[in-house]
A protein has these predicted regions:
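Carbohydrate transferase catalytic cores enriched for Leloir-type hexosyltransferases
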Residues: 1-349
Length: 349
């Protein structure tokens, strides 16, 4: 019998130094794309790890499969190497693609010269050597072009998505909230508390908006100073996080700088009304499915918006209805297909 057409297999090396342990949005992104990419028979994958970083078992566990090839050095026969971790962290002669999630080390440079160099060097290496740079928003594309001096022809926008667990409430067993929040109205903040997250503005605005303490302010990570009425639900898993979104009277995202904004998309997917700062990539992701504060640092504007939305069930209902439809416009399958197309293109250059 005649043989069928043979697949032209592209050998991709992946910088996997952080694959098993990164619990941030970057790790979620890398695992979401790679678990889907591994199903494509046109590609062969080698995961490059280093001393003291995850070995084969850890990478296999992170990707949910034993069919992984792991190496300590970039294979000589790799056609392309992908760096998912916000820049390039090792040198290689293999043609490379790097993902840049934001340009925060340049927008908010450290005052310490050594720390600044450590934070910025992977971005500079990317700007100097990567054949293509993947970003998740037009905002980040503009940041990479203007802050790093990259030709826009080298930049490809591949919007992210959210996992299927982030959905509106379904019929069946009701969500079980942490005991501290049961029977209470609460505003939810999801994420870290570094400078650009602007949590201090939210805390100050919340205190002005709800001085009687009849509304709780819930955090998924402990802020530097826990305000009156503050509740910490530390590091919830995805199922617990989805329940927190669904139970929230409002999700508040005051960040002044986001390359994409996972919490915004997750909240919308769960049908939670969202109030966010009109900053960074957040408006690009949220569109008309979120309410916006124009000046991210304006405490009075935040307080007024919090009060108004908590008092207006109809307005929050409109946002809750728009959110899932907006979130459905984002797809991991499309993000993966776009990523693979770029890797294939660079391997063929």
């Amino acid at each position: 019998l005649p043989e069928g057409p043979r697949l032209n297999v592209v050998h991709v090396a992946v910088d996997a130094h952080n694959l098993a342990r990164d619990d941030r949005g970057i790790g979620r992104y890398a695992r979401a794309v790679l678990t889907r990419a591994l199903r494509d028979e046109r590609f062969r994958w080698t995961f490059v790890v280093r001393d003291l970083f995850p070995k084969r078992a850890a990478v296999a566990h992170a990707l949910g499969t034993d069919a992984v090839e792991v190496a300590r050095r970039v294979p000589r026969d790799a056609g392309v190497m992908w760096f998912p971790w916000n820049g390039m962290f090792l040198r290689t002669d293999v043609p490379s693609v790097a993902t840049v999630h934001d340009a925060a080390p340049f927008a908010f440079p450290s005052g310490d010269a050594r720390k600044r160099a450590i934070e910025q060097n992977p971005f500079l290496a990317t700007a100097n050597t990567a054949r293509r740079i993947l970003v998740q928003s037009r905002f980040t594309a503009d940041e990479v072009e203007h802050r790093l001096g990259v030709d826009p022809e080298r930049i490809v926008v591949t919007p992210l998505a959210v996992d299927s667990i982030f959905t509106p409430a379904q019929s069946g067993a009701p969500d079980v909230l942490p005991v501290e929040l049961r029977g209470r109205r609460y505003v939810l903040h999801v994420g870290a508390h570094d400078e650009r997250k602007n949590t201090g503005t939210l805390i100050a605005a919340f205190a002005r908006a709800f001085p009687a303490g009849d509304v709780a302010l819930a955090f998924t990570r402990r802020p530097p100073s826990l305000p009156a009425g503050g509740v910490v639900i530390d590091a919830p898993d995805d199922a617990a996080l989805a329940a927190l979104y669904r139970g929230a009277a409002l999700v508040a995202l005051p960040s002044t700088y986001e390359g994409f904004g996972f919490p915004l998309l997750e909240a919308m997917a769960c049908g939670a009304p969202v109030l966010a700062a009109r900053a960074g990539a957040l408006p690009e992701v949220g569109g008309d499915a979120a309410a916006w504060v124009d000046d991210a640092h304006d405490v009075e504007a935040w307080a007024a918006a919090l009060r108004a939305l908590l008092a207006d069930d109809a307005a929050r209902g409109v946002l809750a209805a728009r959110g899932p439809a907006r979130a459905a416009e984002f797809s991991w399958e499309r993000c993966t297909a776009q990523t693979l197309a770029v890797l294939e293109e660079v391997a063929a250059l």
